Design a protein with these regions (language model features):
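Active-site nucleophile-adjacent alpha helix/oxyanion-hole segment immediately C-terminal to the catalytic cysteine
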Residues: 1-56
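Conserved active-site-adjacent core of cysteine acyl-enzyme catalytic domains
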Residues: 50-166
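Low-complexity, Gly/Ser/Thr/Pro-rich intrinsically disordered linker/tail segments
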Residues: 168-179
Length: 179
């Protein structure tokens, strides 16, 4: 028997990072969300997923699509409003793909984050993972991440198809602020 193994952690093998991204984004905006309320929200969203999906296993194994994430997000925002009386405003990134480059996208995201927002973003390419960006510099995004990633460096990102870098797309970014 090996003397030292690295154990798998919750999230290492499942595709529920989208659920965690929603909860982490809301916790960043609403410090009154404690562990008990976060657990209640997680269960509420998981039950909603189970009820809407005929076969929940593909979501658990392969992850949450952008469409499913948006539906869960609407549910989570109603939950936050009902339970905390806090209205959270969610905004999709409205950027045309034509003439889009990484610097423009990064600048837009940085401006959003600089005005008290957080953003759920999908990282494709080198990974397939929903995460939360909470602040930005010209070269890095600071993350609140269920996989314990702390920063995303712009030099490791692209908007083009890739398998070796992190691909970002404005259609898979949602910005939030407390109203």
């Amino acid at each position: 028997m090996p003397s030292q193994i690295e154990p798998y952690c919750q999230g290492d093998l499942d595709g529920l990072c989208g659920l965690y991204a929603i909860i982490n984004a809301l916790c960043a905006l609403c410090p009154e969300i404690d562990e008990e309320l976060a657990t209640t929200l997680f269960r509420h969203l998981a039950r909603h997923m189970e009820g809407r999906l005929k076969e929940p296993m593909p979501v658990i194994a392969y992850g949450i699509s952008a469409t499913s994430l948006r539906l869960l997000l609407k549910r989570a925002l109603r939950f936050t409003s009902k339970n905390l009386g806090v209205e959270i405003e969610a905004t999709e990134f409205a950027m045309a793909r034509r003439n889009l480059d990484l610097r423009k996208l990064w600048r837009h995201l940085s401006n959003e984050l600089g005005s008290g927002h957080v953003a759920i973003i999908m990282l494709r390419g080198a990974s397939h993972h929903w995460t939360v960006a909470c602040s930005a510099t010209e070269t890095t995004l600071r993350l609140i991440d269920s996989h314990d990633r702390k920063v995303l460096v712009r030099s490791r990102c692209t908007i083009s198809d890739t398998h070796s870098r992190f691909q970002l797309s404005p259609s898979e970014m949602i910005s939030f602020c407390a109203g």
